[in-house]
Swiss-Prot record:
Complexes and interactors: Part of the 30S ribosomal subunit. Contacts proteins S5 and S12.
Name of protein: Small ribosomal subunit protein uS8
Gene Ontology molecular function: rRNA binding; structural constituent of ribosome
Protein encoded by which gene: rpsH
Keyword flag Ribosomal protein: yes
Domain of life, source organism: Bacteria
C-alpha cells in the first residue's frame, strides 16, 4: 500500500491513538512530521516526541491527556496533495475563535497562525488543531 498523504496519516494516528487512550503512537519519520510534532509540543497538545534513528527512522509521539480526556479535541488536515490551501497574512484563519491553532508552512518554516500573523507572513495551511 502506498501512502498518498503522510501528513494526513500522522494526524489520523494521533487522533486514533487518543481515542483509544494510547500513551504514544509511532509512525515513519520525515522532516515535515518532526516539524509538526515540534509545533504541537510547543503549543502543549502533545507531551513529547522522539525520533528513533534506525534503518527506517521512526517518529514516536507521546500523547497528552488532562483528567483522563485527550488534550486534542480536533485535529484536521486542511491543505492536501490534491488541493493546496494558501492564505496571505491577513487571511490566516483563527481556529475556534483563537482557542485552537492552525499550523502554517511559511518561508521561515512551520509555525502557528499567531506566530505567522506576528511576523507578517502567510503560507500553506497544513492543519487545524483544537
Amino acid at each position: 500500500m502506498s501512502m498518498q498523504d503522510p501528513i494526513a496519516d500522522m494526524l489520523t494516528r494521533i487522533r486514533n491513538g487518543q481515542a483509544a487512550k494510547h500513551v504514544s503512537v509511532k509512525m515513519p519519520s520525515a522532516k515535515l512530521k518532526i516539524a509538526i510534532a515540534k509545533v504541537l509540543k510547543e503549543e502543549g497538545y502533545i507531551t513529547d516526541y522522539a525520533v528513533a534513528d534506525e534503518a527506517k527512522p521512526e517518529l514516536e509521539v507521546t500523547l497528552k491527556y488532562f483528567q483522563g480526556q485527550p488534550v486534542v479535541e480536533t485535529i484536521q488536515r486542511v491543505s492536501r496533495p490534491g488541493l493546496r490551501i494558501y492564505k496571505g497574512k491577513n487571511e490566516l484563519p483563527k481556529v475556534m475563535g483563537g482557542l485552537g491553532v492552525a499550523i502554517v508552512s511559511t518561508s521561515k518554516g512551520l509555525m502557528t497562525d499567531r506566530t505567522a500573523r506576528q511576523n507578517g507572513m502567510g503560507g500553506e495551511v497544513i492543519c487545524y488543531v483544537a
